[in-house]
């Protein structure tokens, strides 16, 4: 399980020691702790995405039970979930709609890390947390020797992911939530 700490806010830039500390970790695997992580993740999804795009609490719990090590979380010192990135690994090159609902598509030896969701609590947005967590996910994917990462996003986020090295491959076959999505790929190998 990944567990790292990082300072936040202006104090981080100034290098002071009184800055709040955030913890980056993967989801826990003990049943009671995982249920708590899943509930927090489902609540964050519900806040950050419209109902037709947000994963249900049941789907989040099933995903987490199947691939807890592929749920990356940033939480504050009090344990409040601020940012979440999650998705399965697979040998499929492209992200498909069925991956959103079928956690069993996860293959621990898969060549590609799919990203199904990136969510940051509204009060924590604009602090670079999603960028930091995605960089952690990218490095973890590299360390595990995978070919790369794939995600889909709406038009307004193409530039954000491009700044992290993802390449826009055009409109995806995915119509998750009834919307047109761009498929973005970051090839590592």
Located regions from the model:
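Conserved acyl-donor/pantetheine-binding loop and adjacent beta-alpha core of acyl/acetyltransferases
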Residues: 80, 84-119, 125, 174-181
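C-terminal "cap" of GNAT-fold acetyltransferases
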Residues: 5-6, 15, 21-23, 154-155, ...
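A short beta-loop-alpha structural element at the N-terminal edge
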Residues: 21-41
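Conserved GNAT acetyl-CoA-binding A-motif
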Residues: 134, 139-154
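Conserved active-site alpha-helix within GNAT-family acetyltransferase domains
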Residues: 143, 155-179
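Active-site rim helix/loop that mediates acceptor-substrate recognition in acyltransferases
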Residues: 50-77, 86-105
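Conserved acetyl-CoA-binding loop-helix of GNAT-fold acetyltransferases
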Residues: 120, 126-139
